[in-house]
Amino acid sequence: MSVTKKPDLTDPVLKEKLAKGMGHNYYGEPAWPNDLLYIFPVVILGTFACVIGLSVLDPAAIGEPANPFATPLEILPEWYFYPVFQLLRTVPNKLLGVLLMAAVPAGLITVPFIENINKFQNPYRRPIATTLFLVGTLVAVWLGIGATLPIEISLTFGLF
């Protein structure tokens, strides 16, 4: 039993494209042995070379020794928690901040149900999901940058 779609070689449009060398490859390329024996080792070795090269060219800096009696003025979380930190910092009600954080995965779960009529996988043909992704990314970057600024200018970046 085959799961790949066989081409209709009687189709005149496909014949014309195949004559020009522009036909679509309906059969695909098998993962064994092409990917597993040839492409994956190249990617793994390339990643390993990048990690080794970057560690040699830019080693980790050894900072000043830790002093448990000198607390910094503001302790910032890791960079990937900046948007959440900014959200909790600027929302006056902490319960509202937690509910806003819970609204993000809840909103992402509802996207397939909102756009269930659309059968396309192309992002240009799925405007709701694409718009939600772009707006969410921009808001996360905006909140992340604002988390590193003082709270007075964190939402406007000091522009207004």
Curated annotation (Swiss-Prot):
SUPFAM superfamilies: a domain/subunit of cytochrome bc1 complex (Ubiquinol-cytochrome c reductase). It is found in: Plastid, Chloroplast thylakoid membrane. PROSITE patterns: CYTB_CTER (PS51003). Gene3D superfamilies: plastocyanin oxidoreductase, Single helix bin. Keywords: Chloroplast, Electron transport, Membrane, Photosynthesis, Plastid, Thylakoid, Transmembrane, Transmembrane helix, Transport. The chain crosses the membrane at residues 36-56, 95-115, 131-151. The keyword Thylakoid applies. InterPro entries: Cyt_b/b6_C, Cyt_b/b6_C_sf, Cyt_b6/f_cplx_suIV, Cytochrome_b_C_euk/bac. The keyword Aminoacyl-tRNA synthetase does not apply. One of its GO terms (cellular component) is mitochondrion. One of its GO terms (biological process) is mitochondrial electron transport, ubiquinol to cytochrome c. Pfam families: Cytochrom_B_C. Component of the cytochrome b6-f complex, which mediates electron transfer between photosystem II (PSII) and photosystem I (PSI), cyclic electron flow around PSI, and state transitions. HAMAP family: Cytb6_f_subIV (MF_01344). PANTHER family: CYTOCHROME B (PTHR19271), CYTOCHROME B_B6 C-TERMINAL REGION PROFILE DOMAIN-CONTAINING PROTEIN (PTHR19271:SF41). This is Cytochrome b6-f complex subunit 4. It comes from Tetradesmus obliquus.
